[in-house]
UniProtKB/Swiss-Prot annotation:
Its biological purpose: This is one of the proteins that bind and probably mediate the attachment of the 5S RNA into the large ribosomal subunit, where it forms part of the central protuberance. In the 70S ribosome it contacts protein S13 of the 30S subunit (bridge B1b), connecting the 2 subunits; this bridge is implicated in subunit movement. Contacts the P site tRNA; the 5S rRNA and some of its associated proteins might help stabilize positioning of ribosome-bound tRNAs.
Disulfide bonds: none
Pfam families found in the cross-reference section: Ribosomal_L5 (PF00281), Ribosomal_L5_C (PF00673)
Highest rank taxon of the organism: Bacteria
One biological process term in Gene Ontology: translation
Subunit and interaction comment: Part of the 50S ribosomal subunit; part of the 5S rRNA/L5/L18/L25 subcomplex. Contacts the 5S rRNA and the P site tRNA. Forms a bridge to the 30S subunit in the 70S ribosome.
Gene: rplE
Family per similarity comment: Belongs to the universal ribosomal protein uL5 family.
Keyword annotations of the record: Ribonucleoprotein, Ribosomal protein, RNA-binding, rRNA-binding, tRNA-binding
Organism: Lactobacillus acidophilus (strain ATCC 700396 / NCK56 / N2 / NCFM)
Protein name: Large ribosomal subunit protein uL5
GO MF, any single term: structural constituent of ribosome
Gene Ontology cellular component list: ribonucleoprotein complex; ribosome
Length: 180
């Protein structure tokens, strides 16, 4: 069974975008390509257990096993050696991507304290949107009692849109709560 947002895209979002931007081909209509979740764990240098906890939390949030990222260069001031594990990332595609986006928009973002909408200035100029989450506790899968420290994560929504305006409209159609 296809995801709710995947069905929503086919039935309402794609036709609305085609009409608004006057696309001639259905292949011109922007769509979400992938969602990348990245959790940098800088304190993993001193305590490797912190990285294991971050990987476990990212697995719960995304529903798939994260890739552990390694340092590209050694930085003496940070006591960092090349090749040390310093974070984790997950790339979501297909139904998992749509399920995560639905959960993010309808469950997690409304749980953010003093939430007034996400910034409209976080587009990169090529139709991709980046969102920073300050604490992982907004996700319903994370048990508040089992968390020993709050960690943030970056969420990058990669679209096939050519411009920021097209990407903003695409995400708005999906229900992304942009700040006025």
């Amino acid at each position: 069974m296809a995801s709710y947002l995947a069905e929503e895209y086919k039935e309402t979002v794609a036709p609305a975008l085609k009409e608004k931007f006057n696309y001639t081909s259905s292949m011109q209509i922007p769509k979400i390509d992938k969602i990348v979740l990245n959790m940098g764990v800088g304190d993993a240098v001193s305590n490797a257990k912190n990285l294991d906890e971050a990987v476990e939390e990212l697995t719960l949030i995304s529903g798939q096993k994260p890739l552990i990222t390694k340092a590209k260069k050694s930085i003496a001031n940070f006591r960092l050696r090349e090749g040390m594990s310093i974070g984790a990332k997950v790339t979501l595609r297909g139904d998992r991507m749509y399920d995560f986006l639905y959960k993010l928009i309808n469950v997690s973002l409304p749980r953010v304290r003093d939430f007034r909408g996400v910034s409209t200035r976080s587009f990169d100029g090529r139709g991709n949107y980046t969102l920073g989450i300050k604490e992982q506790l907004i996700f319903p899968e994370i048990d508040f009692d089992k968390v020993n420290r709050t960690r943030g994560l970056d969420i990058v929504i990669v679209t096939t849109a050519d411009t920021d305006e097209e990407a903003r409209e695409l995400l708005s159609q999906f229900g992304m709560p942009f700040a006025r």
